[in-house]
Amino acid sequence: MCSNSNCYVPFFNWYWPFCGVLAIIFQTILLHLISHKSPATLDGLKIFLYNTSCVQIALITFAFLSQHRLLTNSISAAVLSLGPCSYVSPTTCFINYHVFMATSFGAGSAIAITVLFRFFVLVQNQVHTNQTYIMVLASYIAPLVVLIIPFTDKWDFESAQASTALEHPSYNLSIYYPYSGFSNAGSPQFLSATLLLSIGAYGIPIGCLILTRKVLILIRYHSHMSERTKKQAQTLIHGLIVQSMLPFISYIPSFSGYIYTQSTGRELLICEHLILVSSAFPALLDPFISFYFIVPYRQAIIEWVLPKRQQRITTVTSNSTSGFN
């Protein structure tokens, strides 16, 4: 058990630079694959892949800049940041926090419209370029609302600091001071933003599951697809299912800890850190989902990591083809 309120801080001081660098590297590799290894069959999907990757790069960047833990009080909440933003001002960190939350919503929306695009392709047989851009732009409406709402509320960091010190007298918060926070967690703005984020956190995965099930059925009974194309399309949809469920699964530990803390009054220090970790984790893991479930990218990775193995496979395939002819 932890002996002080900052016992996890050294670990996360190491975790965020390491996680941030790895996420940027893997996202850069993914962008290269999208640009150079996407076959013609993925032309319509590329803009959605680009969009998702870019949003996730922004997500991990804002998480690194913040490196915050969220400490809740009875009527307020403190945003305790140790990232680069803390060297500027509490206001900068608070703005960064809201941008991060909006970007987190945007990352979920990016996956949702990718699933929606696949559905429209199967229903309409073709999605026009204008429709594609409209879908991408529309996916930013809700995140933009989430971003704007907090700026209409009153920011009183001194009040948030006072209530935090009063309700958590055993905490050593000197390493964070001065810090930002919400002075009134019951304000209409706070509740509205929380409601929208909750809808996004739970509604997007559930909606994606319902839609992907319909897409898989459409693929199975599609009369103009070859079996090979059907298999590749199904593999891609399975990847989208994993992507859409990842945020939902990631939020369970931190949300469960939050419920436990609110209902029992006992603190779970790790959960204060896990809220940010779980929100940013998809930016680190999502590239691997694309590497595996998008077959051309998987083949490109294998060729790069195991060139000799791929060469042997190509040789055997060529010999088999020659023998057949």
Swiss-Prot record:
<feature type="transmembrane region" description="Helical">
    <location>
        <begin position="235"/>
        <end position="255"/>
    </location>
</feature>
<feature type="transmembrane region" description="Helical">
    <location>
        <begin position="275"/>
        <end position="295"/>
    </location>
</feature>
<dbReference type="InterPro" id="IPR050920">
    <property type="entry name" value="Nematode_rcpt-like_delta"/>
</dbReference>
<protein>
    <recommendedName>
        <fullName>Serpentine receptor class delta-59</fullName>
    </recommendedName>
</protein>
<comment type="similarity">
    <text>Belongs to the nematode receptor-like protein srd family.</text>
</comment>
<feature type="transmembrane region" description="Helical">
    <location>
        <begin position="132"/>
        <end position="152"/>
    </location>
</feature>
<feature type="transmembrane region" description="Helical">
    <location>
        <begin position="97"/>
        <end position="117"/>
    </location>
</feature>
<feature type="transmembrane region" description="Helical">
    <location>
        <begin position="75"/>
        <end position="95"/>
    </location>
</feature>
<feature type="transmembrane region" description="Helical">
    <location>
        <begin position="190"/>
        <end position="210"/>
    </location>
</feature>
<dbReference type="Pfam" id="PF10317">
    <property type="entry name" value="7TM_GPCR_Srd"/>
</dbReference>
<feature type="transmembrane region" description="Helical">
    <location>
        <begin position="14"/>
        <end position="34"/>
    </location>
</feature>
<dbReference type="InterPro" id="IPR019421">
    <property type="entry name" value="7TM_GPCR_serpentine_rcpt_Srd"/>
</dbReference>
<feature type="transmembrane region" description="Helical">
    <location>
        <begin position="45"/>
        <end position="65"/>
    </location>
</feature>
<keyword id="KW-1133">Transmembrane helix</keyword>
<keyword id="KW-0812">Transmembrane</keyword>
<keyword id="KW-0472">Membrane</keyword>
<dbReference type="GO" id="GO:0016020">
    <property type="term" value="C:membrane"/>
</dbReference>
